[in-house]
Amino acid sequence: MKLHSKGKLKTLAALAILSVALGMGANTVVAADMSHGADNFYKSDKVKTETVKFKNIYGMEVTGTLFTPRNMEAGKKYDALIVGHPFAAVRQQAANLYATKMAEAGFVALSFDQSFWGESAGTPRGAVLPDVYAENFSAAVDFLGTRAFVDREKIGVIGICGSGGFAIAATKMDP
């Protein structure tokens, strides 16, 4: 392209600078809103939550969160789901999101921290004991079965990532 005047060259240069500046603005990253600290996980006004504790057959205390629909009918028995978190995680991450969504859909849901992780008992912290992890699912079924509003014959499991394998192992060991 042949430019015939310095004016056209200046205009072209100005347009090039403007387009680069606009492009850089489109890629600007905005920091997350941390005004509420790190507790920025999804919550629903349609769901009630309660921290619960129960023991597995090894006598270890397992800590979980029970999710129930706010509009539960007195005397009715509800289908329930146990939600296991991904390996090396805690319930406040993916498991609570799944449990909240299930409670919004009308299920009673229970997420829990595997032994050695989060708020559940066990040392050394972060230990990997698949038999204990599978037992925690069985203990969660037993715990939910004691709730008057849960249909003991209709308790299912959602195992996220590695918890899927532990849930399958639990059904094999404790059908």
Residue positions per predicted region:
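Conserved alpha/beta-hydrolase
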Residues: 101-121
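Alpha/beta-hydrolase active-site loop
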Residues: 127-148
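Bacterial N-terminal signal peptides
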Residues: 13-24
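Short beta-strand element of the alpha/beta-hydrolase
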Residues: 75-86
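The serine-hydrolase catalytic nucleophile loop
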Residues: 88-100, 114
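Short glycine-enriched nucleophile-adjacent loop
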Residues: 164-175
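Alpha/beta-hydrolase fold nucleophile elbow
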Residues: 149-161
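N-terminal cap/lid segment of alpha/beta-hydrolase-fold proteins
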Residues: 33-76
